[in-house]
Amino acid sequence: MPTSSQDNRILVLGIGNILWADEGFGVRAVEEFHRRYAVPDNVTILDGGTQGLYLVNYLEEADRLIVFDAIDYGLEPGRLKLVRDDEVPRFTGAKKMSLHQTGFQEVISAADLLGRCPKHLVLIGCQPLDLEDWGGPLTPPVRDQIAPSIDLACQVLAEWGVTVSRRSAPLAESERLLANDIDHANYEMRPA
């Protein structure tokens, strides 16, 4: 298992709805990150799905946070953008960046109001192409950004002194973030 400082609690979080095409980018990215890499004990990998304010407790426990999400930056579809710390909107009056009904900035704001927001925030967002395809897969330009987004997360973790290691064997089904029937390979890549 990789090593890192145990007093530096890190949360790697993917948020989104896998049932709405590109809205599922964050969940699919964190799922693939978990499939590819082993992390030290002070790093938690979480599929936050569409849990909204239920995620506040997880943020309160973290010193540092990396979030994968589909973000409407107004860029060309499939474009990645990384924002850090104060660039990540914390207050509900900020322009909504998240595509979820409860914006993630409300979650950050709630943790901040409780005085327990992570000290360092990194948001890795991908500009969606299609949010209207109920039950549809990620579109190609968004799907193609999963690997580069994971590379960005690994770079951030390295900046924070965290060593991750590539898994040598596939995860057992019981260790996956998502049940086998809704993971990326079995759900989105199934024959039409």
Curated annotation (Swiss-Prot):
GO MF, one annotated term: aspartic-type endopeptidase activity
Cited InterPro entries: Pept_A31_hyd_express, Pept_HybD-like_dom_sf, Peptidase_A31
Keywords (A to Z) from UniProt: Aspartyl protease, Hydrolase, Metal-binding, Nickel, Protease
Pfam families reported for this sequence: HycI
BP GO terms, sorted: protein processing
Binding site for Ni(2+): 23, 69, 100
CDD domains: H2MP_MemB-H2up
Family, as annotated: Belongs to the peptidase A31 family.
Its job: Not known. Could be involved in the processing of hydrogenase.
Protein name: Hydrogenase expression/formation protein HupD
